[in-house]
Amino acid sequence: ASVNDLSMVVEVAYRESGVLFTGDLSAEGEPSPLPDVDVLKVPHHGSAQACSDRMLAELTPQVSVIPVGENNYGHPSEQTLERLESAGSEVYRTDECGAVTVRILKDGAIRVKTYLPVEEP
């Protein structure tokens, strides 16, 4: 196991919604069971070892945020992006859209604000 798997994992719950902050976990370090959350801070900048299929099946995030900048590691990996897309999660990358603010409204609706213009696919 990697020292990254000692990352603090924090779930923030508000009414019926949840957000999971995962630090730099790899698939090996994923806790079990996982909560059903609406928003996921993708582990380890979206590395290839982040977000196993099991994790995404248990979490079912509507929104995933990948904090990543220019790097020599190839983060986020194509495999992780494909897993998030297959899980039906809306993905926001800070290298493409700048800072990301996520608000959960009283009715459970999720509002995402990006600080750079985001091109529609």
Language model features by range: what are they?
Residues 1-76:
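Active-site-proximal loop/helix segments of hydrolase catalytic cores
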Residues 1-4, 71-121:
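Binuclear metal-ion centers of metallo-dependent hydrolases, dominated by the metallo-beta-lactamase
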